[in-house]
Amino acid sequence: MAETIVMIHGMWGGSWYWGNYKKFFEGKGYRCIIPTLRFHDMDPKAVPNPALGATSLLDYAGDLEEEIRRLDSQAIIMGHSMGGLLAQILGSRGLAKALVLLTPASPGGINALKPSVIKSFASVLSGYGFWKKPNRQTFNEAVYSMLRLLPLEEQREIYDRFVYESGRAASELGFWFLDAKGASKVDEKKVSCPVLVIAGSKDNITPASVVRKVADKYGAVSTYKEFPNHAHWVIGEPDWQEIADYVSVWLNQALTGSGH
């Protein structure tokens, strides 16, 4: 039976942005399942559901857990950006055969508020009550934080597909130290499967220095790989295939038990 990969998108995104990876990994014989997070299946130009603003990371994780538990076998869970944090939460619930974290957001306990990260969220953070409202980056922020290595035309195309994100989820991520519920916390002792953590040296929103700490958190089960010519949009930047190839080789080794 083919191995299953569940691919979890990040902030402002949707299942659409996994197109390259879906085609690549289906070509390797994997079955790919690409959920869309709650309230993200919307017209980018439409007014977002007001309930989005108060949606927690744990709401997203709960929805994903339900979907994953319906599968007939344990899946590989792959997440990009905020999806990488959701993958870690799901991994700590014993739901993953392996975790692949692509430029992941960091769990509570790791300080991610570097100057470039704050700049990435400047317009969001400047609005009063941002922690309970739907939010969206400006085009310039999206380019600076995520899309800077793409051609202008592609930057526009991707930005125009971005939807609103939950202010609560963003706050649980960035300001975990103010969150009494600890929504972004992950108990690393409960993650026993192999973990691959990918960083881009040019990433502004999940800087490599922070992503390395994510890998360190999982100790012996984790593998850290940093790509010097990549930033945040590793699923679609020029030469994205080199990262997908690396992931594919690592998965082969991790799943056959020949080391990771």
Sequence positions of predicted segments:
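Active-site glycine-rich loops that stabilize anionic/oxyanionic intermediates
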Residues: 10-13, 201
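Conserved alpha/beta-hydrolase
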Residues: 26-48
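Conserved acidic catalytic loop of the alpha/beta-hydrolase fold
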Residues: 59-75
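Gly/Ala-rich beta-loop-alpha elbow adjacent to hydrolase catalytic centers
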Residues: 79-83, 87
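Flexible "cap/lid" loop of the alpha/beta hydrolase fold
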Residues: 95-132, 169-177
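Short beta-strand/loop motif that positions the catalytic acidic residue
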Residues: 191, 197-199, 203
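Conserved alpha/beta-hydrolase "acid-adjacent" motif
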Residues: 204-210
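Catalytic active-site module of serine/aspartate enzymes centered on a nucleophile-bearing elbow/loop
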Residues: 221-260
